[in-house]
Amino acid sequence: QICLSLVKLLFYLAHSPLGSIALLDFQPRQFVMVDGNLKVTDMDDASTEELSCKEDNDCTLDFPTKSFPLQCSAVGKCKGINEKKNLFNAYRYFFTYLLPHSAPPALQPFLSDILNATGDLRYGINETLKAFEKVLHLYKSGLYLQKRPLLLKDYISLKGFRTVEGEDYKCWPSYSHLGCLLSVHSAEEAAAICNSQSQCQSFIITQQRTWTGRPLASFQSSLTDLIPDANAVVYIKRSASSGKRL
């Protein structure tokens, strides 16, 4: 969410009515989330000035670990320097830390492509936004899910109940520090996740959803007391429920 919102912001800055705008002090502290959207807290360090040049050799974009040769345009300005400066800063301050951990394994290759392409500045902001929107579409639609045997048949479902909340085993990237709370496309995907985790014996899906509209599933290692909840469904492994009273 943070990376996509940042890319949308940089897309606007690249195509603003004032011209391409560079953020000169590009640090995480300069941004804040407001209603799910990333905002710049201080525009005093923004500039529409693009480096003047006479030839391509005048247009090197330097960073501490990398340098990028750019073209000198016919009007004597380094072509796209503000856009590329913003994009590489987004790569080094945000993408490298957030993208490797922010999607299911099947989507990781798409995020790796974005990471590599922005790190080498092979993508401009237009291509970067398009790539992010493709990943978001795959994520929200569930099209990334690989065809696999139906696993939900191995679970008993109890509608209108949930288990008592409490601390349980942890997983990454969890929405809760108390246990394993992940977003899923469906109960079938949740069953696949539960099967892949040796501690998991059951999971609960409620109507709580993430910013993408995906439901949250809470994975648990033991069967605890059930309490009524009209908006929840408990799924318990048949192997875990055998011999236990439900």
Annotate each language-model stretch with its function.
Residues 10-18, 86, 98-103, 136-143, ...:
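Eukaryotic basic, amphipathic alpha-helical target segments in cytosolic regions
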Residues 132-139, 143-246:
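Extracellular disulfide-rich cysteine clusters
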Residues 22-31, 105-115, 128-133, 145-150, ...:
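Short amphipathic alpha-helical segments embedded in low-complexity Lys/Glu-rich regions
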Residues 10-42:
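Catalytic-loop of the protein kinase fold
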Residues 28-30, 113, 120, 124, ...:
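C-terminal, well-structured subdomains that either form a transmembrane helix-short loop-helix hairpin
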Residues 102-123, 211-227:
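C-terminal/domain-terminus segments
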Residues 21, 34-119, 127, 131:
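C-lobe/activation-segment region of protein kinase-like
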